[in-house]
Amino acid sequence: AVAHVLYGYNTLLAHEVGAGKSFEMAASAMELKRLGLCQKSLFVVPNHLTEQWASEFLRLYPHAKLLVTSKKDFEPGNRKKFCARIATGDYDAVIIGHSQFEKIPLSAERQERLIQEQMDEIEEAIEEAKAQVGEHFTVKQLEKLRKSLKQKLKKLQGADRKDDVVTFEQLGVDRLFVDESQNYKNLFLYTKMRNVAGLSTSEAQKSSDMFGKCRYLDEITGGRGVIFATGTPISNSMTEMYTLCLLYTSPSPRDVEE
């Protein structure tokens, strides 16, 4: 598993509970840095497990230099300072909670580009559906999605842009380790299929945020910067495999569908 993280592409550690995923991730991060294959690893773990994760990491590497977040670090008055510590510090690993990870935004420009890409794909799908007989429901569904994305884009463009916000791109992170990655399974999805059990087209903001950050890491690492770990990669929905493909390979949704 460690060798795959070092020399392969984006990795999914889908071992059962107790199999040693935490140690695999810690060893991977330390070896990546020792070999000069990455500069900074960010561990995103369940909020209540940040200290436990740090303890496990130090049990394997007692002299590792870690930066571990606390609840106070992401309070409004402290967030910028903590993000600056991530950006300027030389750490073997930075460990933060899931909800704290969401509070570190991608740049507005990158968010706008991702939304526009989704809108372009929907526009193409609408034209294809209009050309086919009996796809009236699909067209309506896609137009609803397009409207929702337009509103999202308009809100983003109208938001105040503060120059002092530290964005995810500015952290200097080039490896992302995500524990309990099944929490990010509800991703943007459009499909012609209807009345299929377990087929959900709803999207969670945290999943959308994760997708954008994975896309960024793919760009700067050549598709080697994302390592997910979970004991339940697919639990109860047929769309979860689709989501995995999007997060780990980052093609367009239409490429995956084809």
What is each of the regions a protein language model found here?
Residues 16:
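P-loop (Walker A) phosphate-binding loop of NTP-binding proteins
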Residues 9-11, 92, 174-175, 225:
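The start of beta-strands in P-loop NTPase/AAA+ ATPase cores
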Residues 248-258:
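Single conserved hydrophobic/aromatic residue that forms the stacking wall/gate
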Residues 238-244:
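Short regulatory helix/loop adjacent to the ATP-binding pocket of P-loop NTPases
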Residues 19-214, 237, 254:
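SF2 helicase/translocase NTPase motor core
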Residues 224-235:
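Conserved helicase ATPase motor motifs in RecA-like P-loop NTPase domains
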Residues 1-12:
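Conserved pre-motif I regulatory segment
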